[in-house]
Amino acid sequence: MAGNHAGPDLLFGFPTIFFGTLAVAGSLGFFFNMKWGRLPKIGEKYYDVIVLTLGLWCLVGLLIDSFAHISGTVDDTFFTPWHAIWYSGATAYGAYIFYVLLPEEGISHMIRNPFESLKGIEPQHKPGVYGIIIFGISGVGDMIWHETLGVESSLDILLSPTHIGLFIGLIMSVSAPVWSAWADPSSGIKGLKSQMLLVFGIGAAWSVILLMFRFANLWIAPIESFCYSSQLNLCKNDRYEDALSIGLQSLYIQAGITSAMLIIFLQRWEPARGSMFLILTFNTVSLFVYTEFDRNVIYMGLVWAILVELALPIYHKLGAKIYIPFIVSTQLIVLIASWYIRASDIANATYWIEGNDLHVLPFGWTIHSTIGSVVICAVIGWLASIIGFPNHQPEMNLK
């Protein structure tokens, strides 16, 4: 059931923001069209810049809308101000893609042969085009879903079928410059400036994926959901095995996601100074929003990003199969260190013994699991790097 709809002020905000931002975008488009003679088509100079800018517009809308859902400040309608930002960006993105696909024969020819233009797109440019199409279809479905079945809250936003379509479409859209540059042998070889589009594309895609898996992220989860203490009421888990299981499940998932996102970048490009820091900064900013602006996340994220950036010589000397495990393990080490500094909020003692087991702060896990969890995260990163960077197979001559 749809429930109660928003009041006049909330509804008024949607058209004002939606059409206002589109008017600004249209004015900028007209300006650059006059300056350049025409806006760039697929594969031309500045095409990837425009696509990424429009994708980031959508991402900002997603972050704002996600915060509204997470904090419970949504109303039971589709037409909210935060949706206006998200969908105005998608409309602008879609309008630009429509322009670049428009054949010389005009709109009538495109209507009669809607798939002809899509067939001619080179493979490296398809994610951006197909992504906004998926996003648009899912957006219409999302409006119908909200107006008939109501608005999701909390973790429900991650499982709404229309939201899943929006997530997939947005990941493809914001990562479009990455796939466009993948086929260009000269991309990303002239320092940080040449890798900015790649960094922003991967970082933005990672932001969406973090939202999809926010239920399994110890940087987001309250510590009482995965800590253990037989002497305190803070921790929700009465059984140690339950606390450890919840924590490990989240660690495994995030270690895999972190490894995968970094492998995409490192498989193709040699990271310039500053690129790894910026990619992880995207991660940090997203988590900051998803935790409802927990400043501790900012501190942890910046420390992690600095450590990874300073460790770049490890990559140059020892390769990705050592560097990626280092990144994944330090992600957990920073979390443990941060909570250990705040250990006074959890218990007066830094350790205690139950039976034959030594339990230590900050999570109350045994010393075996506390140290072993860091090791297993490194192992996950190592296994992922083996898959991402396999040894060259010898040519098989069966004659």
Feature roles, as predicted:
Residues 32-47, 105-125, 184-197, 391-399:
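Membrane-interfacial, low-structure loops and terminal tails that flank and connect transmembrane helices
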Residues 1-12, 41, 63-84, 144-162, ...:
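Membrane-interface interhelical loops and short amphipathic "cap" helices
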Residues 16-31, 84-104, 164-180, 249-265, ...:
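Hydrophobic cores of alpha-helical transmembrane segments in multi-pass inner/ER membrane proteins
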Residues 50-61, 126-143, 166-175, 195-218, ...:
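Alpha-helical transmembrane segments of multi-pass integral membrane proteins
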Residues 26-32, 57-69:
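Alpha-helical transmembrane segments of multi-pass membrane proteins
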Residues 301, 310-397:
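C-terminal transmembrane helix-loop-helix hairpin of multi-pass membrane proteins
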Residues 5-21, 43-53, 74-95, 122-127, ...:
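Membrane-entry segments of alpha-helical transmembrane domains in multi-pass membrane proteins
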Residues 77, 114-130, 141-200:
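Membrane-interface helix-loop-helix junctions at boundaries between adjacent transmembrane segments
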